[in-house]
């Protein structure tokens, strides 16, 4: 399973009503809210065995799956 597939699977567990693969502006446009964001961070932490620090919790890191994947990759292996 690729990192992108793992990411999409984790996101689907949080919000299965959103097609994350084609979405941009997830936070900026209100597609996901603060509760979703909290659940997404927990799902990513668990799926990738990483810890996302509070300083990284900003809209630019969660507006698209590409942004989230870049965030995950920054913390893999740390």
Pin down the residues of each PLM region:
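Two-component histidine kinase catalytic core, primarily the HATPase_c
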Residues: 36
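Residue-level recognition of oxygen-bearing side chains
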Residues: 6, 25, 67
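Phosphopantetheine carrier-protein modules
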Residues: 12-31, 50-58
